[in-house]
Amino acid sequence: MAFKFKTFAAVGALIGSLALAGCGQDEKDPNHIKVGVIVGAEQQVAEVAQKVAKEKYGLDVELVTFNDYVLPNEALSKGDIDANAFQHKPYLDQQIKDRGYKLVSVGKTFVYPIAGYSKKIKSLDELKDGSQVAVPNDPTNLGRSLLLLQKVGLIKLKDGVSLLPTSLDIVENPKNLKIVELEAPQLPRSLDDAQIALAVINTTYASQIGLTPAKDGIFVEDKDSPYVNLIVTREDNKDAENVKKFVQAYQSDEVYEAANKVFNGGAVKGW
């Protein structure tokens, strides 16, 4: 029995060693990378980057899809993925501040303008007093939306709010609009809500129901927006070869052409 136990223990130890060795190889493999993206239009763009990465750089890109803005950074921080491509710098900065993530940008992708959409009105002149306006509830995209509402004259924010105003910073509201904060994935569905007259939606989610800023937006964020999307990884992974190869693949003409096709001209090159 003692002999058998030693044999099984040795076999178990060998299997464990091989498993650990395999994990180490996967983590350091310069020709493989796991990248988190948001399901939908951005996923389609990333799939082109995936193809370019394989053909030009011999890099196998495994895309991991998410349905919200919170989980991709959580997964990256835990080491479940090697990089993600979905967020702009103000959002990344806020996540780092709030959650203590050790994440860093390694490349820029595109600006995807936010816009105001509606199934109830065709112009802001038709927006009635007391109407409900839906906006994303995460701090950076909420601020981005409020700044856009101010730019088109619907509200006025107090001076000095920078990029992160909240509803409490509204000092003038001529139409007595009711700002309704929702999770970003819920915003497209809010357009069918009888109570919601207008919704400010990120291009990523608007495209999931066939909407584009240039064609369907009642008002659209300027193309000189500071909210360029980023490729992000962990600080201890920023110099990895697989990350560098993926950035090169993403910042290619093929991906730029695909983004413009997917977003009907709504993607602006950020690099």
Swiss-Prot record:
Keywords: Amino-acid transport, Cell membrane, Lipoprotein, Membrane, Palmitate, Signal, Transport. A lipid is attached at residue 23 (N-palmitoyl cysteine). PANTHER family: D-METHIONINE-BINDING LIPOPROTEIN METQ (PTHR30429), D-METHIONINE-BINDING LIPOPROTEIN METQ-RELATED (PTHR30429:SF1). A lipid is attached at residue 23 (S-diacylglycerol cysteine). The gene is metQ. It comes from Salmonella typhi. This protein is a component of a D-methionine permease, a binding protein-dependent, ATP-driven transport system. One of its GO terms (cellular component) is plasma membrane. The MetNIQ system is also to be able to transport the toxic methionine analog alpha-methyl-methionine. It is found in: Cell membrane. Residues 1-22 form the signal peptide. PROSITE patterns: PROKAR_LIPOPROTEIN (PS51257). GO terms for biological process: amino acid transport. It is a lipid-anchor. Belongs to the NlpA lipoprotein family. This is D-methionine-binding lipoprotein MetQ.
